[in-house]
Amino acid sequence: MLTIAIPKGGLLPEAIALLQQVGLDFSAFLDKKNRQLQITDPTGTARAMLVRTHDVPVYVEYGQAQLGFAGYDVLREKKPDVANLLDLGFGGCRLSVAVPKASPYKNPRQLPPNCRVASKFVNCAKDYFRDLDLPIEVIPLHGSVELGPITGMSEAIVDLVSTGNTLRENNLEEVEVLFHSTVRLIAHPTSYRANRHNMLDWVQKLEQIL
């Protein structure tokens, strides 16, 4: 049976709505009383696993799910061995460098060598500043990255931005966009090549409604 890894949180409703358009109903995940992490479509055609956003590519890479919905930001950070098949067009955001509004640095290239940058996206931040040939120390954080500059722990942050409201409320401003991100359909490469569980048919159905 085809298994699809879908992300918890804000991306879940749109992921479920998209799957409903191709005949797969996992809306039970939207029931607040639901505690199941894996459910089967009422037709018995496929099952879905509800996992954390950053874990979607892990389950796909290791073959526990044949398909998954993963943010491009997660794929850039984790660099998993998966096939990136389709841009699903929702969950739009961008990964940006931000500094305090009062900062004298209005461009990442102006940051002093060996300064500190706080981020959840450690690999993306390191890759970006390496390309600039600017040595920096990346401080890994898992939440409230904005506190880095506020507390003086870092001169800048690299973080996801959607509306920019959180930055503004914390007196931070974007100075550079690293890349834009949307949710992608990913697949386990070997399963996809072998067309396990008619994966190609489902991918084509999704492609047709985009």
Swiss-Prot record:
Lacks the C-terminal regulatory region which is replaced by HisZ. Heteromultimer composed of HisG and HisZ subunits. Its main location: cytoplasm. It is found in: Cytoplasm. It catalyses: 1-(5-phospho-beta-D-ribosyl)-ATP + diphosphate = 5-phospho-alpha-D-ribose 1-diphosphate + ATP. This is ATP phosphoribosyltransferase. Keywords: Amino-acid biosynthesis, ATP-binding, Cytoplasm, Glycosyltransferase, Histidine biosynthesis, Nucleotide-binding, Transferase. HAMAP family: HisG_Short. It comes from Picosynechococcus sp. (strain ATCC 27264 / PCC 7002 / PR-6). GO terms for molecular function: ATP binding; ATP phosphoribosyltransferase activity. Pathway: Amino-acid biosynthesis; L-histidine biosynthesis; L-histidine from 5-phospho-alpha-D-ribose 1-diphosphate: step 1/9. One of its GO terms (cellular component) is cytoplasm. Belongs to the ATP phosphoribosyltransferase family. Short subfamily. It comes from the Bacteria. The keyword Glycosyltransferase applies. SUPFAM superfamilies: Periplasmic binding protein-like II. Its EC number is 2.4.2.17.
